[in-house]
Each structure stands twice: as structure tokens, then as C-alpha cells.
């Protein structure tokens, strides 16, 4: 099992990131997640806590999947006026796990929508752990109804 220094999960959140209030009760329970939105730059991140880890002391794949499923549509909300207020339920989510994210690591991701149609969003992103690529994600999302304000902000 990997052991991080005792203060690893209390390391400061990188400058510019603020707590994410969107996502509903599930993500509030499993987070906290943070967002940085400065101009065209949109990043999401979180610090790997003990409750996020697998028996090897690394980020559990299920938590990575949860993060990716938040990262991609919420990035699209902030980058596209076309769907900024719409609920984007996941149709398909593909994740390639590239490397482990150890306890205490800062996990950060960015995503882009290469294509938006009248009913679907196609998007992709990259996730890093302390700057090292750890996951590649792509997804297809349905353009749903107008979302409650606290679901997308």
C-alpha cells in the first residue's frame, strides 16, 4: 500500500480554484470538487483523500469515473453558450486509465466539446495527477431540458 505524508490530503488547493457548488447531493457527498474558470480556461480538480482510494492507496477507478462524468459536461456548460443552461445526461463515457493517482495527489482535468449537434454533445478531456496524465476521457451527452441553476453553476 502506498502511504502519503500525513499532510498530503490537507495540502492547499491550487490558486484560482473555488469550491464547485453544482452537481447535486451525490457530488457534494463524494467531493469536494473545485473549479477554475478564467476566460476560456476551465479546469476542475480535487485532492485525493483516503475515502477516495482503493486498497493500494491510489484513487479508486469509480471516483475517477465520477470525476470524469462531472468534468466533461460541466466543462461544456462553461465553454458553449449553446448548452450552458441545459442538463447533459451521459449517453456514453469512455475512460482510459493511464496512471495511478496516489493519495494526496491533486487531480485536475480539462475538457472540450469538438462537436455539438441539435441533440448531442461530443466531448473529450484529459485528467492529470500532480501534472502527470492519469486518464483520458471521451463522452456523448444528450442535450436535455433546462437544468436547475444549481446543477450547472
Regions found by a protein language model. Name each.
Residues 1-153:
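Terminal targeting signals and extreme-terminal segments of soluble enzymes
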Amino acid at each position: 500500500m502506498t502511504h502519503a505524508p500525513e499532510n498530503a490530503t490537507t495540502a492547499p488547493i491550487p490558486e484560482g480554484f473555488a469550491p464547485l457548488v453544482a452537481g447535486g447531493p451525490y457530488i457534494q457527498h463524494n467531493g469536494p470538487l473545485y473549479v477554475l474558470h478564467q476566460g476560456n480556461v476551465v479546469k476542475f480538480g480535487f485532492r485525493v483523500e483516503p475515502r477516495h482510494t482503493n486498497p493500494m492507496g491510489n484513487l479508486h477507478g469509480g471516483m475517477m469515473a465520477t470525476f470524469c462524468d462531472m468534468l466533461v459536461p460541466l466543462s461544456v456548460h462553461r465553454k458553449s453558450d449553446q448548452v450552458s443552461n441545459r442538463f447533459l445526461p451521459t449517453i456514453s463515457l469512455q475512460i482510459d486509465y493511464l496512471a495511478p493517482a496516489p493519495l494526496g495527489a491533486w487531480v485536475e482535468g480539462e475538457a472540450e466539446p469538438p462537436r455539438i449537434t441539435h441533440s448531442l454533445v461530443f466531448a473529450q478531456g484529459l485528467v492529470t495527477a500532480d501534472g502527470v496524465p492519469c486518464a483520458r476521457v471521451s463522452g456523448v451527452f444528450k442535450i436535455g431540458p433546462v437544468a436547475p441553476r444549481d446543477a450547472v453553476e
